């Protein structure tokens, strides 16, 4: 039968909505831009229902909660769950990236923040899940949570007052390979070590940076914490991009290396450090 749908635009409302009409119409206009990426109008209608119900849901933000909010609690959910297996994720994020670029000044660099996080889960059969260090745990005690490791990129949309809000423009799951048993053979252990290297969060970030680099010809300024301010990522930044990252205050900063004929390059790495970030911060002459 036809998919369960919430009313489009301002249809079938019970009372005055004041500014809600324009808000819902604007949101519907944004959703309509995602329609070409779906295989059929029915799939788009089901996805639209879940998105709108997710905004109205006052309970847990799950598929069950969204469908219950949409009034489909006692109906067959098979089509709704099968939809999640064929969502056009790449085309959806491409549309969001275009909208985020259009909302910023085309003459200025595109500012994109990146960070890794843990999405907590409860099911033990969800792919990519494992025990991870709790980023919100106290510093004096190591806590573990069950969830997925993900990498998210958010574009900064400036406001009139000088502040900015972040809009997600890319999302990538970054699972770690399962560690083999103690009795595994050497070939299995070697394969695990190689898979662990490929699953490094910095390598995943480099791949997604290269993907976002194709979204625009404008310069891109990446903003990150200290996790991504390292040699692995800095040496493989995409063309016409800049990374603004956090570092420790006692980090040793060196002058750029200058090649000299007849000199061995690694000897120049022994030059003394110029200063540290803390010294630069407290130096009034800088």
Question: Where do the language-model regions lie?
Answer:
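Active-site-proximal, Lys/Arg-enriched surface segment
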Residues: 86-175, 284
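Gly/serine-rich nucleotide phosphate-binding loop at the start of the catalytic core
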Residues: 19-82
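Gly/Ser/Thr-rich loops at beta-strand to alpha-helix junctions
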Residues: 57, 118-120, 226-230
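Intrinsically disordered, low-complexity and often Lys/Arg-enriched segments
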Residues: 1-25, 29
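Short, conserved acidic/polar surface loops in the N-terminal third of protein domains
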Residues: 121-127, 163-168, 180-184, 234-235, ...
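Electropositive, glycine- and tryptophan-enriched low-complexity nucleic-acid-binding patches
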Residues: 73-82, 136-219
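An internal, acidic/charged active-site-proximal segment
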Residues: 186-286
């Amino acid at each position: 039968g036809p998919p369960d749908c919430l009313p489009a635009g301002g249809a079938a409302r019970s009372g005055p909505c004041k500014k809600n009409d324009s808000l819902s119409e604007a949101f519907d206009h944004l959703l309509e831009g995602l329609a070409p990426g779906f295989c059929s109008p029915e799939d788009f209608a089901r996805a639209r229902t879940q998105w709108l119900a997710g905004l109205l849901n006052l309970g847990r933000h799950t598929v069950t909660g969204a469908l219950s909010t949409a009034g489909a609690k006692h109906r067959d959910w098979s089509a709704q769950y099968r939809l999640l297996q064929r969502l056009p994720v790449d085309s959806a994020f491409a549309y969001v990236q275009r909208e985020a670029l259009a909302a910023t000044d085309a003459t200025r660099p595109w500012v994109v923040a990146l960070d890794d996080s843990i999405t907590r889960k409860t099911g033990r059969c969800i792919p990519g899940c494992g025990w991870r260090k709790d980023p919100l745990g106290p510093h004096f005690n190591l806590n573990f949570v069950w969830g997925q490791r993900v990498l998210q990129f958010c574009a900064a949309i400036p406001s009139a007052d000088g502040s900015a809000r972040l809009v997600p423009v890319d999302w990538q799951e970054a699972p770690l390979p399962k560690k083999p048993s103690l009795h595994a053979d050497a070939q299995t252990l070697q394969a695990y070590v190689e898979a662990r290297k490929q699953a490094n969060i910095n390598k995943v970030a480099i791949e997604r940076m290269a993907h976002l680099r194709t979204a625009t010809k404008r310069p891109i300024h990446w903003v990150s914490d200290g996790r991504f301010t390292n040699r692995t990522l800095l040496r493989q930044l995409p063309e016409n991009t800049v990374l603004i990252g956090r570092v420790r205050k006692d980090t040793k900063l060196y002058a750029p290396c200058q090649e000299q004929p007849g000199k061995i390059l690694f000897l120049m790495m022994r030059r003394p450090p110029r200063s540290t970030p803390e010294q630069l911060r407290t130096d009034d002459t800088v």
